[in-house]
C-alpha cells in the first residue's frame, strides 16, 4: 500500500488510482532556452524514482512531461543568438535528453510540446471565454480568477489575502488585479499565431493545462513539480482545468524541495548556477543521481563537493560489496543450513518496501541498501558461499538498483579493484593452508577469467593484469 504526501490536503494519503493498476502522471518539464541546471535535474530524478517504484509494484505508469518551447525567455534567447525560437528549442530539447539520459532518467511516455498543441490551446481558451471564465481585453485574454470558487486551495491561501499586493501593470487591461493571462497579444518581431482573439501566443499556465488534458484526460492521478511551481503556476492550472473540464484536475499533488549551493540559494547573480551539462563532466552522473536521492524528495538539499564526495564513497561501498557477491557466485556451491541469511535479506527488502511505500523515502531506502551491503560483506568473509544465498543477494541488489535507478556497476568498472583481488588472494592462501586445494584452484581460475595472473615470489603471492 503506497502512501504519498498530497500538497492539496497537506497530509499523507493512501494512493488510489483512477483506473486500477494504472497511474496517470504529469510532471512539469523545462523551458528549453538553455541547458538544464541541477535544480531542474532534481524533479527529473525524484519523479523517475516514483515512476520506477510504481512499476515495481505492478502499476502501468503513463508518464507525461512537457517541453515549454515558446516563452519570453526563448524569445529573448532567439533574439540574442539571431536564431529562430524553434531552432533554440530543438537544440536544448536534444541537450535535455542527453543530460537526463546520463542521469539514468527513463524516457517519458510522452513529451508534448506547446507548439504542437497550439490549436488545442486556442480552442481551450475559447471554451473558457464562452463559459464566462475568461475575457478578451486589448488583444490579451485573461482568466477571471474570482469566478473560480476554489482558487487558492493548493497553496492554501485565501483570495482576499492574495488581493493584497496584487497590481495591474501598465498596458494591462484586467478587470481584476488577480486575473492572469491566457493569451498574450503579439509584439512586433515576436513569434505569434492567429486566433479568434488576434495574433499572439499563449500564457505559461494554460499550456500545461491543455497538454495534460490532451495527453491524460480531464482528471489525472498525480501532478508533480518543484515547490516553486506550487503558486502561481499549479494554482492557475487547477483553476483553468477545473473551470474547463468540470472535474478535479489532479487527485494528488507532489512537490520536491529546493537545491541550495553551499547553503545559498542557487542564482546567476551569485555565480553559483550549476548546469548539468557542465557538472557531469566532473562528477560521475551515477554519483550525482545517488546524491540527489540521498535526501527525501520533499526536503531541501544542499549541494557541495564534500557531500557529493560522501555520496561517491557510499555508492562505491555498495558497488564493491556487490562485486564481491558476483565474484563468489562463480565459486558458490549448494550448501544448506544458511536460511538465516535468506531471512535477513528478506527483512532488508521488506524494510526497503516499507520506507518506499511511505511517501517514497529514498533516504531510508538507501540506508536499507547500505545494510544489505554490510550483510553481504559479512556473509562473504565468514561463510562458505551458498548458491541460494548468493542468488538472493544478487536479486535484491538488482531490485534496489532498478527502483532507485542507480547502476550496480560504473560505466568503466569492468575490472576488479586491486583491494578486492588482494582479499581473494588472502582467501586462496587460507584455503591452501587448510589443504582445500579445490577452493584454491577455483579462486585462481576465477581470477584468470578476469585476466589476473597470480605469481609465487619469495615475498608471497603477487598478481598482474594480463
UniProtKB/Swiss-Prot annotation:
A biological-process GO annotation: cysteinyl-tRNA aminoacylation
Superkingdom as given in the UniProt entry: Bacteria
GO terms for cellular component: cytosol
Main location: cytoplasm
Motif ('KMSKS' region): 265-269
Transmembrane segment boundaries: none
Placement of sequence motif 'HIGH' region: 30-40
Cofactor note: Binds 1 zinc ion per subunit.
CDD domains recorded: CysRS_core (cd00672)
Location in or out of the cell: Cytoplasm
Residues annotated as binding ATP: 268
Gene3D superfamilies, per database record: Cysteine-tRNA ligase, C-terminal anti-codon recognition domain, HUPs
Any Pfam family hit: DALR_2
PANTHER family noted in UniProt: CYSTEINE--TRNA LIGASE, CYTOPLASMIC (PTHR10890:SF3), CYSTEINYL-TRNA SYNTHETASE (PTHR10890)
NCBIfam families assigned to the protein according to its UniProt record, in alphabetical order: cysS
Subunit comment: Monomer.
Annotated family: Belongs to the class-I aminoacyl-tRNA synthetase family.
Protein name: Cysteine--tRNA ligase
The organism's taxonomic lineage, starting at the top: Bacteria, Bacillati, Bacillota, Bacilli, Bacillales
Amino acid at each position: 500500500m503506497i502512501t504519498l504526501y498530497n500538497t492539496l490536503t497537506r497530509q499523507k494519503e493512501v494512493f488510489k488510482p483512477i483506473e486500477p493498476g494504472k497511474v496517470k502522471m504529469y510532471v512539469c518539464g523545462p523551458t528549453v532556452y538553455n541547458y538544464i541546471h541541477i535544480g531542474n535535474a532534481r524533479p527529473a530524478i525524484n519523479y523517475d524514482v516514483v515512476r520506477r517504484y510504481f512499476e515495481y509494484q505492478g502499476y502501468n505508469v503513463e508518464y507525461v512531461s512537457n517541453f515549454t518551447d515558446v516563452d519570453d525567455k526563448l524569445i529573448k534567447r532567439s533574439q540574442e543568438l539571431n536564431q529562430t525560437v524553434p531552432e533554440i528549442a530543438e537544440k536544448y530539447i536534444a541537450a535535455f535528453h542527453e543530460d537526463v539520459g546520463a542521469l539514468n532518467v527513463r524516457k517519458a511516455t510522452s513529451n508534448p510540446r506547446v507548439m504542437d498543441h497550439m490549436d488545442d490551446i486556442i480552442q481551450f481558451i475559447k471554451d473558457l471565454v464562452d463559459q464566462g471564465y475568461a475575457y478578451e481585453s486589448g488583444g490579451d485574454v485573461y482568466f477571471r480568477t474570482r469566478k473560480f470558487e476554489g482558487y487558492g486551495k493548493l497553496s492554501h491561501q485565501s483570495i482576499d489575502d492574495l488581493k493584497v499586493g496584487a497590481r495591474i501593470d501598465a498596458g494591462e487591461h484586467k478587470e481584476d488585479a488577480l486575473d492572469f493571462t491566457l493569451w498574450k497579444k503579439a509584439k512586433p518581431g515576436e513569434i505569434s499565431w492567429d486566433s479568434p482573439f488576434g495574433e499572439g501566443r499563449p500564457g505559461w499556465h494554460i499550456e500545461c493545462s491543455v497538454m495534460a488534458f490532451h495527453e491524460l484526460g480531464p482528471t489525472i492521478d498525480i501532478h508533480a513539480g518543484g515547490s516553486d511551481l506550487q503558486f502561481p503556476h499549479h494554482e492557475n492550472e487547477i483553476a483553468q482545468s477545473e473551470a474547463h473540464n468540470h472535474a478535479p484536475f489532479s487527485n494528488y499533488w507532489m512537490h520536491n524541495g529546493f537545491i541550495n549551493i553551499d547553503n545559498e540559494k542557487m542564482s546567476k547573480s551569485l555565480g553559483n548556477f550549476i548546469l548539468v551539462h557542465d557538472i557531469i563532466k566532473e562528477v560521475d552522473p551515477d554519483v550525482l543521481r545517488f546524491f540527489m536521492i540521498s535526501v527525501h524528495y520533499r526536503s531541501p538539499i544542499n549541494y557541495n563537493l564534500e557531500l557529493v564526495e560522501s555520496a561517491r564513497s557510499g555508492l562505491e561501498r555498495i558497488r564493491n560489496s556487490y562485486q564481491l557477491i558476483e565474484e563468489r557466485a562463480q565459486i558458490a556451491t549448494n550448501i544448506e543450513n544458511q536460511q538465516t541469511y535468506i531471512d535477513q535479506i528478506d527483512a532488508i527488502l521488506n524494510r526497503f518496501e516499507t520506507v518506499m511505500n511511505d511517501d517514497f523515502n529514498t533516504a531510508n531506502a538507501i540506508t536499507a541498501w547500505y545494510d544489505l551491503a554490510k550483510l553481504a560483506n559479512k556473509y562473504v568473509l565468514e561463510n562458505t558461499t551458498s548458491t541460494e544465498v548468493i542468488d538472493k543477494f544478487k536479486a535484491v541488489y538488482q531490485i534496489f538498483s532498478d527502483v532507485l535507478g542507480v547502476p550496480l556497476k560504473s560505466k568503466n568498472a569492468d575490472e576488479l579493484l586491486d583491494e578486492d583481488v588482494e582479499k581473494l588472494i588472502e582467501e586462496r592462501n587460507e584455503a591452501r593452508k587448510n589443504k582445500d586445494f579445490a577452493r584454491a584452484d577455483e579462486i585462481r581460475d576465477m581470477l584468470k577469467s578476469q585476466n589476473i595472473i597470480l605469481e609465487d615470489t619469495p615475498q608471497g603471492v603477487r598478481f598482474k593484469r594480463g
